[in-house]
Amino acid sequence: MKAIVNVFLKAGVLDAQGKAVHHALTSLHFNNVSNVRVGKQIIFSLDEKDEKKAMTAVTKMCEELLANTVIEDYTIELIK
């Protein structure tokens, strides 16, 4: 099973990278861009057939290592 974890700063937390990317895009005359957020995507294989067990394991990974849950939110997608 393949897991895709997306991690982004929570709404209300200053996204300095997002601001920098937005500024760079507007300086390149891409003026129709707004609300730029920069995050990270972690993709890995998981040796687990049971989807519920896989989701539980990946959630635990996010809570303990992959995301700083004080300032970040995450989403998990499992692909068989």
Where are these regions (language model features)?
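Short glycine-/aliphatic-rich beta-strand segments at the starts of folded cytosolic domains
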Residues: 1-11, 42-43
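Short, conserved charged micro-motifs
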Residues: 14-16, 49-56
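Solvent-exposed residues in well-ordered beta-strands and their adjoining turns
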Residues: 8-10, 47, 79
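C-terminal structural segments of small proteins and small subunits
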Residues: 52-80
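Short Gly/Ser/Thr- and Asp/Glu-enriched loop/turn motifs at secondary-structure junctions
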Residues: 37-41
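Small, basic N-terminal interaction modules of short regulatory proteins
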Residues: 5, 11-12, 31, 50
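A short linear hydrophobic-aromatic micro-motif
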Residues: 29-34, 73
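Short amphipathic alpha-helix segments
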Residues: 12-28
